[in-house]
Amino acid sequence: DMEAGNLTREFAQELMDCIWVKLNDLNKCRDAASAEGFAGYSLFQNLIAGGQNKDGEDVTNDLSFMCIQASMHVHLPAPSLSVRVWNGSPHEFLIKAAELTRTGIGLPAYYNDEVIIPSLESRGLTLQDARDYNIIGCVEPQKSGKTNGWHDAAFFNMCRPLELVFSNGVDKGVQIGPKTGNVEDMKTFDEFYDAYKAQMDYAIALLVNADNAIDMAHAERAPLPFLASMVDDCIKRGKTLEQGGAVYNFTGPQGFGVANMADALYAVKKLVYDENKITMHDLKMALNTNYGKGLRSD
């Protein structure tokens, strides 16, 4: 239409801005805990700009720039604008994305094709499908139209196994993790770290069992045939998404507290094992008393 003179670029941009406004008509009422955890009017309507096609050719075009400009104009939460960047991304496109970042509205999110495409291949996607990935929800990459991706299948607290190392797997008198030994007897950081990994392995195994049970329940009790009709190869296989009909099937738990866990492990290594500034006995006592919070000095 623009080439034929039926539409000016300015009016086309205005139409795009109107779509952005319309996307914010939706809202979701949440309970108090969810509202706190998902604050910011997030509905996870993710939209991708830039990137490459299945043949490895850059697909950045005028519409890519207009998407960024729309977010700059309306300054609204939706859509969750993401940009795919790689070695073939036009410099002008990266500058435009940076201009949106500079506004401070938290958009766009940047996704590195050079890392994500190989990671998807490692999970069984063909190179062509991996190149054609998009982002769903907040941060999860997948090949749309071919994937049953159960994202946010669980929230895994990365710090919880570390806490259990100090109690030999006991919580409030109940043995909920493996017995990894008395933490005060761990003479090296490697011993401590091995105990942490053992606690994590045990907890993750429980998580996998729970997610698998839910998957089976969904397949048996809550199949979604209409949704299956829009995803390859459900019809060909005669299975719904929940029964494994899609070309790719993934369950994606989220790891939470990664930075806190890394900080905690480093603090233990540095202060207890490397510099001997605190004993493991004193650290354990400090943790058990929440560093003295709420305790009377007398």
Regions found by a protein language model. Name each.
Residues D1-D298:
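Conserved catalytic cores of very large enzyme subunits
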